[in-house]
Amino acid sequence: MTVFKHIAIIGLGLIGSSAARATKAYCPDVTVSLYDKSEFVRDRARALNLGDNVTDDIQDAVREADLVLLCVPVRAMGIVAAAMAPALKKDVIICDTGSVKVSVIKTLQDNLPNHIIVPSHPLAGTENNGPDAGFAELFQDHPVILTPDAHTPAQAIAYIADYWEEIGGRINLMSAEHHDHVLALTSHLPHVIAYQLIGMVSGYEKKSRTPIMRYSAGSFRDATRVAASEPRLWQDIMLENAPALLPVLDHFIADLKKLRTAIASQDGDYLLEHFKESQKARLALKTDHDIRP
């Protein structure tokens, strides 16, 4: 059972609204206060009964909280932290849910130097966003990565781990640097590819003035599903994780050039071996938990 009695959730998109629902479902004794900068989102949160209190004042939301869960875009973390800082209790724990860790941790530490911060990243989601997109089961059996540093109190880490486990998550610990490299490979690069692929095909369609995408089969739809994700959110992620993403992107481009060379030179042996190795890796992935991005 979580030790937290009052949780404030800042940002009510997919992750924030799901955390609110999950907290109410699995931690019914916890008071949940909610804040989002959007009046429309706040009104939807009230209509959906996502929390005990939905406020238009971020300081009111966090004033009594012993856990503040930050579910805002990574480039909004600093603004949010500065806005809520004067109202925070001394012993409150701050936990972000961002997809980038190194830069976000620095931003939070700069703005909240006297508070305990336990960075986290639930590896759960869909291409949908907003308070209506969330659901209480989102985190069930999905990894939640915690990236504390040497100065993070062990008790605070345990409290945050217990909370995520209470609402369904599976805890993993790693350094912030390793997290950003891993996510550049497994999440951020796939989003780059999805946005670029559907953008390229759409461009072909517009230029040729002939229908193309109406003939897309399952492979195209699967490969581009995450391009339906919120663009501004992913703009922030790409820019904030550029130090980890750019080398990964360079590696991908180099490998793509090798494939092009093999196709141009009719090197079937290279293609077959490459496809076999890739198939083997994908089939092995199916035996583990299939994580939504």
Swiss-Prot record:
pH-dependent activity: Optimum pH is 6.6 for both activities.
GO molecular function annotation: cyclohexadienyl dehydrogenase activity; NAD+ binding; prephenate dehydrogenase (NAD+) activity; prephenate dehydrogenase (NADP+) activity; protein homodimerization activity
Function: Can function as either prephenate dehydrogenase or as arogenate dehydrogenase in the biosynthesis of L-tyrosine. Catalyzes two analogous reactions: converts prephenate to 4-hydroxyphenylpyruvate and transforms L-arogenate to L-tyrosine. Is not able to utilize NADP(+) instead of NAD(+) as cosubstrate.
SUPFAM superfamilies reported in the protein's UniProt record: 6-phosphogluconate dehydrogenase C-terminal domain-like, NAD(P)-binding Rossmann-fold domains
Organism from which the protein derives: Zymomonas mobilis subsp. mobilis (strain ATCC 31821 / ZM4 / CP4)
Gene name in the database record: tyrC
Protein name: Cyclohexadienyl dehydrogenase
GO biological process, one term: tyrosine biosynthetic process
Organism ancestry: Bacteria, Pseudomonadati, Pseudomonadota, Alphaproteobacteria, Sphingomonadales
Activity regulation field: Insensitive to feedback inhibition by L-tyrosine.
Keyword Transmembrane helix applies: no
Source species, domain of life: Bacteria
Family, per entry: Belongs to the prephenate/arogenate dehydrogenase family.
Prephenate/arogenate dehydrogenase domain span: 5-293
Residues annotated for NAD(+) binding in this entry: 6-30
